[in-house]
Each structure stands twice: as C-alpha cells, then as structure tokens.
Amino acid sequence: MQLNIIGAGLAGCEAALWLADRGVQVDLYEQKPTKFSPAHKSEGFAELICSNSLKAERPDSASGLLKIEMKMMGSHLLDAAETARVAAGGALAVDRDVFSTAVTEMVEKHPNITVHREEVTALDESAPVLVASGPLTEGALAQAVAALTGDHRLSFYDAVAPIVTAESLDYDKVFAASRYGRGEADYLNCPFNKEEYENFHAALIAAERAPLHDFDGDLTVYEGCMPIEVMAARGADTIRFGPLRPVGLRDPRTGHRPWAAVQLRAENTARTLYNLVGFQTNLKWGEQKRVFSMIPGLEHAEFVRYGVMHRNTFLESPKVLTKQQFLADHPNVFFAGQITGFEGYMESAASGLLAAHQILARLQGCELPPPPAATMCGALLDYITTPNKDFQPMGANMGILPRTEEINTIRDKRERYMALSQNAQDAMCAWTEEYK
C-alpha cells in the first residue's frame, strides 16, 4: 500500500505517521526549503506560526475533549507536544522549535515514510492522494485544486463574524423576528435604545485593532466586505443605516422600533450557535469581548469564535467534500487540515487523523463511517460537510455537539459540558473499538 501526502504541517505529519505505523508506504512532499510561504520561517515540519498554545486540556473544555479523542485515535503529535511542553497553567503550550524538531525527527526516521523536499504543482488522481497543504496554499497547487473543485469553491481570505452560543444570550432582551414579519422568525434581534447605541458606537470606533501579518496583505481588495469598526468610523449613523438598521423590527418590550438592532443568524441546524450578522472585524479578541458584550442581550455571551480577517485558503467543503474527506467528484483526492475548514492547530491535526483512517480503509478495500456526531471530531466533520450558504472555518467548541434532553436539563455549565464530554468520549471509544 502506498500514498502520497502533500504538506508536512500538523495534518500531513499526523496522517503520515499513523498510516506508516500500519504498513502504508508514505511519500510525503514538503516544499520547504525549496520554497517558503510568506508565513513560514523554518525548515522543520509542523511549524507553529501564530501561537505556541495548543489550548486547554480540561476534559470539560472543547479543546481538552478534542485531545482526548485524538489520543483514542492514536495521535503522534500529542506525544511530540508532551516532549516540548512549557508551563502554561491549564493549557498545553509548547516550545515551537522543540515541537517542530520532535515531529520532524519522528517523520524522517520512520522507515515507511520517504520525504521529498520539493514543490508539488499538479495532482495525480491515478491513486489516492492526501492534500494537507495548509491555509496558505497558493500558486500552481492552488490552481490544481481549483481545477478540481471549481474556482468558486476555493476561498483565499477569511472575513468572519463572531459566533456566540445560544444558551448564553439574554432572552429578556433578545427577540426572534424577521423584518416586517416576513416568513419565519429566522433571526434573533438585539435592540438598542439611543443611549445604548451611542455608547456602543463610541467604544467600537475607539477599540484596538489587531495588526495584520505581512502575509495577510490588503484584505479589503479581495473581500469586498468592510470591517464593522471601519464602517462605524465613517459616521455616527453609518452602521445604523447598514447592518444595524432597525427597519421592519418592533421591540416587544416597548412596542416600538428600536434605535438600532444587531441581528444574529443561526450558524448550525441545531441553532445552538449564532453569528453576528455583518460583524466582520479586525479588532483584537479581548476588545471584541469587551465591545460586543455591550450589545443588549450579549452582556454575558459566550464567544466560541471571534471575528477574524486574514489570509486563509480553504475549500467550500460542504459543496465538494464527503464525510470521508475526499472530493465527491474526484474520489482519489482526499483533503485534511485547515484547507478543509478545520480551524486551529489541534483541529488540523485531528483532521489528518480522520483522513488517515479513511484512506487506510480505502486502501484495504473497506468502507468506514465517520465518527459519530456526538464526538468533537465527528461534530467538526459534520459541520464542514453540512450545507451552509455562508460556510466559514470552525474550531472545536461545545456548541457544535448535539444535546440530549437530559443534558439540556443540567443547569450548571461546567457539569453540562462534562456530560457532553463524557458522551463524546463514550461514542469515540465505541467507534475506535469497532473500527480499529
């Protein structure tokens, strides 16, 4: 059995090591040092760019649960992370250089992995191939991917609004309605009075913005969508006549039209997550929490994702990718990592593990169902392959896990999350036992 893997990032290395352990002859292609992306600096594999934190380890946290599931699936990168661990309280943080060196050595010393330090410019569909080229995929490879998926199915920039959990909203203030009462009440609305709006506007235009990385470039040229803080700076009423326009809405508390209103749109079919419509932003994350918590009804909102605007090459996965992580119209071409819409270091590595399981099944002539949606891995996979007219990448969070009626009755948040985590662990344990 033989497989080509393109990209020696977290997803590619995780997949390569897992498959090689099971007798697959892996040819791993990495363009460094022949060619560097604008973000990468070292020749090592699994290079961490923006942070050395691999997030929380608590089992009642989304990140902690994800790591538990990855261990059940046979993660090698978590072993490497342990050797590179640095003190970080309840989080798993690593020395980036030590981590990258550990992963590189694991890969280069494995007898079933052959490393090719060269750029890949075309995709050979004659046999299974795994594309794990990352969020900065560009040039000939990006063109090759676009040729298979269609140019309109490959995005090159993220402009994402914040996402909050439904259970953290204040429904004494937030109300469901569509403008003018047309159709179903598909939106949740957060109504401002004049004073609330003016205070929010002042805080928004004064908030500190995140610096763009060199590789992000001028995003507005490509996005055609303006950050909410930039729009607000144009005038006191600009956003009130834009994304915060209150026309067609009536606040049930007052019986009148609000001065302004933020609309929340469901992010998933279970309606456990909502995004802030029109709130693409480049504010620092701490500022987003501070300023957006001034929105009526969001005072205690739990943000599962903050808004970002950055360079990010990713597939419109719900339109092109199966739950087995291959292209629906090109079944020998598998994808893993951030290019699929898995957002985050550990999420990327997890998607590599998931793809590896599917590829081994293919090479053995078997079919493998994905992990149950009750698991964090299964929920993420379900998210990126479920139709969504405004698809954006997603990281691990408790909001994407399905809830049972019993879990919904648990009032304490930490206990509720622990119950979700235990359900997920049980489901992943059963899946790995059945399909190991």
Regions found by a protein language model. Name each.
Residues 17-79, 373-384:
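N-terminal FAD cofactor-binding segment of flavoenzymes
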Residues 3, 24-26, 129, 154:
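Hydrophobic anchor at the start of a short beta-strand
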Residues 1-11:
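Beta1/beta-strand and adjacent pyrophosphate-binding region of the FAD-binding site
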Residues 109-290:
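Predominantly flavin-linked oxidoreductase catalytic cores and closely associated redox partners
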Residues 391-436:
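C-terminal auxiliary extensions adjacent to catalytic cores
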Residues 348-370:
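Internal hydrophobic alpha-helix adjacent to the cofactor/substrate pocket in enzyme cavities
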Residues 276-342, 349-351, 369-386, 391-397, ...:
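A glycine-rich dinucleotide-binding beta-alpha-beta segment and adjacent secondary-structure elements
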Residues 57-104, 108:
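A conserved beta-strand/loop capping segment in the N-terminal third of enzymes
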